[in-house]
Curated annotation (Swiss-Prot):
Residues 9-79, 93-161 bind DNA. Reduction/oxidation of cysteine residues Cys-23, Cys-45 and Cys-104 and a possible intramolecular disulfide bond involving Cys-23 and Cys-45 give rise to different redox forms with specific functional activities in various cellular compartments: 1- fully reduced HMGB3 (HMGB3C23hC45hC104h), 2- disulfide HMGB3 (HMGB3C23-C45C104h) and 3- sulfonyl HMGB3 (HMGB3C23soC45soC104so). Signal peptide: none annotated. The modification Phosphoserine is found at residue 98. The modification N6-acetyllysine is found at residues 3, 30, 43, 112, 139. The gene is HMGB3. Belongs to the HMGB family. SUPFAM superfamilies: HMG-box. GO terms for molecular function: DNA binding, bending; double-stranded DNA binding; four-way junction DNA binding. Pfam families: HMG_box, HMG_box_2. The modification Cysteine sulfonic acid (-SO3H) is found at residues 23, 45, 104. This is High mobility group protein B3. Keywords: Acetylation, Chromosome, Cytoplasm, Disulfide bond, DNA-binding, Immunity, Innate immunity, Nucleus, Oxidation, Phosphoprotein, Repeat, Transcription, Transcription regulation.
Length: 200
C-alpha cells in the first residue's frame, strides 16, 4: 500500500531545518568520503545554531518564510483533492486553546516588542521556558480559562451537529469568520513551535 499521497506538497521547512541542510551540504563538499554520523552531526548543528547571532540566522529565517509561501500556495492548489478527506467547514467551532497557548497569546507580543527581529523558534523557546518556570498556582488561571473554553467548545460542537453544517442565518458571519481564520493561520506556525516547547 502506498504511503501517503504522492501529489501532496512537500512539507514546509523551518529555519533550523534549512541550517541543518546547509551544514550537511558543507560536510559533503569538505569530506565527500566520510559518512555522516547522524547523532553526532545533529548535536554539532544544534550547538552551532545556539551560538549564532540573529543576523546569521536571518538568512535561514528568510528561506523558511519563502518556503512557507511555496507550501501555502501548493496546499491551496492541492486542497480540494486531499485524499478524499472532507474539507474543513469554516462554520465548525474552532478547537479551544490549551492553558499554555493562552499564556503564549498573552506574552508573545511582549517578547516580540522587547526583542525586535526575534525568530519564531526563539519566541517559542522563551515562552516554553517561561511557562516551565511558573508554579502550579501561577499556571492555574490559564488552565481554568482553557477548561471553560473547552466546555463551551463541546457545547458549540453539540449545537453545530444538531443544527447541521449549513445554517442560512450564519451567512452574514462568514466574512468576519474568514478574517479571523486568516489571522489564526498567521499564528499556526508559531503555535506548532510552541507546542514542541511545551512537550520538551
Amino acid at each position: 500500500m502506498a504511503k501517503g499521497d504522492p501529489k501532496k506538497p512537500k512539507g514546509k521547512m523551518s529555519a533550523y531545518a534549512f541550517f541543518v541542510q546547509t551544514c550537511r551540504e558543507e560536510h559533503k563538499k569538505k569530506n565527500p568520503e566520510v559518512p555522516v554520523n547522524f547523532a553526532e552531526f545533529s548535536k554539532k548543528c544544534s550547538e552551532r545554531w545556539k551560538t549564532m547571532s540573529g543576523k546569521e540566522k536571518s538568512k535561514f529565517d528568510e528561506m523558511a518564510k519563502a518556503d512557507k509561501v511555496r507550501y501555502d500556495r501548493e496546499m491551496k492548489d492541492y486542497g480540494p483533492a486531499k485524499g478524499g478527506k472532507k474539507k474543513k467547514d469554516p462554520n465548525a467551532p474552532k478547537r479551544p486553546p490549551s492553558g499554555f497557548f493562552l499564556f503564549c497569546s498573552e506574552f508573545r507580543p511582549k517578547i516580540k516588542s522587547a526583542n525586535p527581529g526575534i525568530s519564531i523558534g526563539d519566541v517559542a523557546k522563551k515562552l516554553g521556558e517561561m511557562w516551565n518556570n511558573l508554579s502550579d498556582s501561577e499556571k492555574q488561571p490559564y488552565i481554568n480559562k482553557a477548561a471553560k473554553l473547552k466546555e463551551k467548545y463541546e457545547k458549540d460542537v453539540a449545537d453545530y451537529k444538531s443544527k447541521g453544517k449549513f445554517d442560512g442565518a450564519k451567512g452574514a458571519a462568514k466574512v468576519a469568520r474568514k478574517k479571523v481564520e486568516e489571522e489564526d493561520e498567521e499564528d499556526e506556525e508559531e503555535e506548532e513551535e510552541e507546542e514542541e516547547e511545551e512537550d520538551e
